[in-house]
A protein has these predicted regions:
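N-terminal leader segment of winged-helix/HTH proteins
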Residues: 1-26, 72
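Short amphipathic alpha-helix starts
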Residues: 10-14, 60, 89-92
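N-terminal helix-turn-helix DNA-binding core of bacterial DNA-binding proteins
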Residues: 17-61
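Charged, amphipathic alpha-helical coiled-coil/dimerization segments
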Residues: 68-127
Length: 142
């Protein structure tokens, strides 16, 4: 397996496959679900541009889905003081049941990823990711 290409593709495909039944049940497109969950899980990133740049969803898909989510009452858009071009996206009460189900699904997905591993293996994995994260920070400094 090519860790640089195959693993991320497989991880994304598995996540989407796990999400598909819930998205069907809720009658919500995967991209709209991803946007809601991104906003719920990342409160420091609250604009459409953040979703494009951080979550790597194409701008046109973000635009169309944000418009529909706002129209359907799942998100609200408010102006950001000092920047007329940006609008803060926030989840409404109507979105909370979807977010709750989504968080359960994400935890279940995470648990499935670590099936057949020991607590020590999980701990080592987490520590290794932390080290890699710090190494990346150092690379980006210089």
């Amino acid at each position: 397996m090519n860790m640089g290409i195959d693993f991320p593709k497989k991880l994304t495909a598995a996540y989407n496959a796990v999400c598909k039944p819930l998205c069907r049940e809720l009658n919500i497109p995967q991209t709209a679900f991803d946007i809601l969950m991104f906003l719920a899980n990342n409160p420091d990133y609250s604009t459409a541009g953040d979703i494009v740049n951080v979550r790597k969803i194409k701008a046109n898909l973000v635009s169309v889905n944000v418009e529909k989510l706002a129209k359907d009452g799942y998100i609200e858009r408010t102006n950001i003081e000092g920047d007329r071009r940006k609008r803060r996206l926030s989840l409404t009460e109507k979105a909370q049941p979807i977010v709750g189900r989504g968080k359960q699904l994400q935890q279940s997905f995470f648990d499935m990823l670590f099936e057949n591993t020991t607590d020590e293996m999980k701990k080592n994995f987490t520590e290794t990711i932390g080290i890699i994260d710090r190494n990346l920070d150092e690379m980006l400094k210089g």
